Amino acid sequence: MVAGCSNTKTKQSSSDSSLQSQSSIDAKYINLTMVTPKTINPITNTDKSVGYIMNLVYDSLFTIDENYNVIPQLVKEYNIAQDGMSIDIKLKDAKWHDGKNVTSNDVNYTIGLIQKSADSPYNEFTKNIASVNIKSDKDFTIKFKARYAFSIDSLIFPIVSQNHLDSKDVNDKNNNMIGNGKYKIESYTEREGMVLSVNKDYYEEVPKTMKNIKVGMVPNEDARTSMVMALDSDITNVTLNDLSKFQEKEFNITKYQGRDYECVLFNYNNPFFKDVNFRKAIAHSIDKDRIISEGYMDDATPVNFPLNSKSKYYNSEMKDLEFNKDKAIECLAKVEYANVNSVNQNDNKVKNQKKSAKKNSKKLTPEEEAKAKKAEEDRIKKEAEEKKNREKEEVKKSLSEMNLKIIVNRDNSERIKTANIINENLKAIGINSTINQLSDKDMENALNSKNYDLALVGWKLSIIPDASSIIASSGYTDDKLNGYMSALTSSTSEIETKKAYKDVQTYIKDNATFISLAVRNNYIVSNSRLKGKITPNDFDVYEGISNLDIKSNESN
């Protein structure tokens, strides 16, 4: 599903023929692993490794392509109502692996099962669904509780069989053996694992070279990695920490854009951050290129907004606030501290009232009144200039004495490196800062109590391209942004949504409400005995596995 392939680099083995003899791998199959499942029901399962396998067995109404955009899967035709409150859908001529048709009743049953399963990873996606109106075996209408721009993007849950699950134990493995995807479950035991065979009756054409798959059971995620290292499994997703173990000729490394988003938050309880010029000064001072190369060791894709950079809603034409020391200093010179000299302003007001009262007690000639008026205007102008100069000096003094508190999780080495770079960048424009490395609990407490000035944090981007929760969590709000966000979430067409998102992204950039840094890259490691290209993504690491073949000398 959520496909987001980035650059792919391949390291080929010069001795492929030796690999088979070095391992217990079954050369006729593509060999995968999953943690021993509690259930193989794709709706109630909560283990990622199991979910990746079941994505091969079950299809969804819609799925996500390699650019993180929604596309139809089981859906043949669809039409969104003009008011955005419903969607009419016609299904493709898909069949279950037992030969029966996938029907509207299966969709209705699946939605009901998800809504009853509070722990389902798909539960959130169905909360806006009010009802399903079945018109025929292939035609139905989904009605929504509220208008929502990303209603289609939410329909990416796998469809399960009503016939095999209704009024039965939904978690019993024997009731979950029949799917509708490109692969069907040939056999499954905890001891022998699972064998997936090519579904030759799939509703769309599949590659002629498509291979069967054998899935081994392992106790935990670490074992999945170890199996590939030992050449006993062909493919797995790995963390950056494990990646260095695979820099050998036996493996292919595929890099793709994940969903871990990194950014810098401002504390708006600090009056300086309420000044857009101060925020822009911070933004212009930060060297993002250096952060990507040194902080994240080129293991991230730079972004200027919390969306995957390949999304159709991401404004790639929008230029970020560039790293420019001179512009940063120019912005600092424009900073105004609204609360400076508030006591003096009140004192001056009282004095002016007394002076005016005293002057008004004496009757003046027209010439004297004109002269007095001119003198008063000059005095007010002079006082205004003096006040402005005092405030400038006060701001300069405050900036020179400022020591911004930067908080960062002590267990995240990349963010610590980034914090040190930001510390150096700020010092270059005359702003001092101190880095506080905190535990998970202390980090959470500091964020909740607003005990920071800058915070280096991360979010897991939603599968649905809705950045509203991240924007809300940034702490910045005003009527104009609220208006843009309302227009975004209530838009009813792709054109409207793109326009609204463009307005939101431009406004956030122009006002430097927070600083987007990057989306982290993820990695898939595969045995070099395989050939072909896959397009993994954070939601479905085996996306495109049907395109893989086994080198001829490996399958003999």
Q: Language-model segments: which ranges?
A:
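Aromatic- and charge-enriched surface segment that lines or borders ligand/interaction sites
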Residues: 76-118, 272
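N-terminal lobe/hinge region of extracytoplasmic solute-binding protein
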Residues: 32-80, 112, 178
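Surface-exposed binding/hinge segments that line
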Residues: 79, 124-165, 187
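Ligand-site clamp/hinge motif
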Residues: 201-244, 432
